[in-house]
Each structure stands twice: as C-alpha cells, then as structure tokens.
Amino acid sequence: MTLRKLGWLLLGALLVAGAGEAQERKVPYWASINTGDALMRTGPERTYPATWRYRRRDLPIQVLQVYGNWRRIREQDGTEGWMLATLLSAQRTAVVTGNGPAPMYADPSSSASLNWRAEPGVVGRISNCESGWCLFDVGGKRGFVEVNRIWGVDAGEVVE
C-alpha cells in the first residue's frame, strides 16, 4: 500500500470516528454558532421553512435533540428550532445577561482587581469555569465573570 493511500485511509477513519463522537454527546449540551450566516428551521430538513437567520458568529446555543445531521436548539430568549450540525461548533461561548455591565475580574473573586466590564448582550468565549466563575474572553480582553451574569453555562458546570 502506498503512503498516499494510507494517508487517505487514516483521514477517513478520523472523520468517521469524529462523527460518531458528536452523535454520542448527551443532550442537552452547549454549543455555539460557527458561522456568520446560519438558518434556524421549523424541522430537521432543508425543506422546512427558515424561521430565523443568525448573523452573529459564536452565539451560544443549547442543543436539545439530535436527529441525523440536524440539531434542535434553543437560544437565549427561549426560541427553539432546527439547525444543521455543520453550522455549530463545540467552542464554548456565553452572552452577558442582566442589568448593567458585568464585571470581569483578574481572578475568580469579586475582591480581585477589575479588568473590564462587559455590557449585556456581549458574546465571548468561556473556559476555566468552576465554583460559580468563568474566564470570559471578548476579543482578547479577558476576565472572570460570575456564572449568574452569563447565559451559556449551567450553574455548577465545570468547563476546562
């Protein structure tokens, strides 16, 4: 077998393994929209009408159901519908909620120095979530935000 054929076989095996892993995730789970143009539909096929067009990359969503290559999702305001799995990413993101800016601290403590403030509606990537805090990154501006000020992570959830 040539090296080229072996490479194609390995690539195919990785793609199949990755697809199976995505199917096995336990719902509900968090994900994000990975494109600046995504349609939410009323059902799990392209023949169903689109109800919403999303033009905001990294918007957090919650996956409620898996049906083939389709995911039934819920967004922050409670709207539910179907979206192609290829439009979604495992990248964890969150959106600031509540009244007024959310403080972003240097450490996961309200007594730590204040790095930034993020207005409600600001979307950022999250990591290092534990004990009620998440590291929130908005275009390189980072700080720890209390979990109760963001939508995109469950209370008590640990995110690496």
Where do the protein language model's features map onto the residues?
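Bacterial N-terminal signal peptides that target proteins for export
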Residues: M1-W8
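N-terminal signal peptide c-region/cleavage motif recognized by signal peptidases
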Residues: A17-A19
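SH3-family beta-barrel domains
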Residues: A22-T42, R53-R57, L64-T79, M83-P108, ...
